[in-house]
């Protein structure tokens, strides 16, 4: 779930 990490 790297996409969620983008939020960071």
From Swiss-Prot:
Detected in the coelomic fluid. It is found in: Secreted, Extracellular space. It comes from Echinometra lucunter. The keyword Secreted applies. GO terms for cellular component: extracellular region. Pro-inflammatory agent which mediates the degranulation of mast cells thus evoking an inflammatory response. In vivo, when injected into rats, diminishes the pain threshold. Induces dose-dependent paw edema in mice. The keyword Repeat does not apply. May be produced from vitellogenin or creatine kinase by limited proteolysis. Keywords: Mast cell degranulation, Secreted. This is Echinometrin. Its main location: secreted.
């Amino acid at each position: 779930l790297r996409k969620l990490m983008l939020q960071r």
